[in-house]
Every structure is written in C-alpha cells, then in structure tokens.
C-alpha cells in the first residue's frame, strides 16, 4: 500500500523537523550502497549505463540530470544484485510529471539475469504506480516475501501513455546483512590447521630417515 512522506507540522521547529526527517529518510534509503553496481543491468535503456544512475542518495532523488529512459518501447527491466542479503521494506519510484512516468512495477526476488520473456512468470509482488515527480510516495512490499533477498528484479511494463518510460530515482529501504560463508572458512582453516599440526612430524620423520 503506497503512502506519502509529507507531513504537516504546527508551531515552532518546522524547518528543523523537515531537516531531521530528510536525514532520517536518507539513512533509511541507503540500500543503494549495498548494490553490486558493476553487475547491475538495465534492459532496454536508451543510453548504456544510465540505469545505474537512478540508484542514488535520497537527497538527490530530484536531480533531473541523471535518469534512465527506455529505448525501443516503454519497457524497462532492472536486474539488481546485492553484496549481501536484504530485507526489503519500501520502494520509491520517482519519474517525470508526465505520461513517461511508469504506471506499474512487477517485483521478483532471487531470479538473476531475468529477461523480458522471463517476466511472464508468477510475480512476487506488483504495484500500480502513481505519478511521483518529487519522490514522496513509498510502496511497501510484504516483508515476509522479501526477507532474504540477494537479487531483486524490477520490471516496468508500461507507463501512462508515452512511447518511452523515464525514471529519475529508485529508492530501496530495508535491512542489510553480510553474506557469510562459514562452511568454507572453517574448512580452509581446518586444512591449514591440520597441515600445521603435522608439519613438524613430517620433517621429524624425514630427519630420522636421513639419519
């Protein structure tokens, strides 16, 4: 269910409250720093690499100098790998205040390298979007469906009637946890430990044989 972030504040401290709120949102919407940017891909982007630029700080969400625009038609598809696991709690989609703004997003989890044909499979969740040129509307995924996500796919199949879709900002809010490989670490450690344990014995044996 989408909801806005703008609030009415009465009395003193209006500006301070707005600043505090902006700082809080900036911290909450920092999952973009956990994206494996080198392997992030955007299908049907008009300018190569432009899809990566819409994942930026919350306070830069209204920066119109960086955006992604679709090429052949209105579809855009983002394959977003993370450097660990996330629990997705909120999404903001900021586009132009015209018909190029996407009107729907379909979300898939843990399906790397999806294509437009792959997007026909059962979706994990989808939202009807509202024009949001200021980046004030948050869409809240069902956390139970997105509690352990290492790869996220966002598919925008259409817009409000333009030939091309344009997006300025995609914000992701949630929790992040590092990917741990305890089994590998322990095995490597044990292998090194065993070699060290037997090192002296091996050399002792060789020494005795030579003598």
Swiss-Prot record:
Q: InterPro entries in the record, alphabetically?
A: Galactose-bd-like_sf, PITH1-like, PITH_dom, PITH_dom_sf
Q: Which SUPFAM superfamilies match?
A: Galactose-binding domain-like
Domain PITH residues, every copy: 20-192
Its domain of life? Eukaryota
GO terms for cellular component: cytoplasm; nucleus
**A Pfam family matched in the record:** PITH
Q: Which family does it belong to?
A: Belongs to the PITHD1 family.
Q: What is this protein called?
A: PITH domain-containing protein GA19395
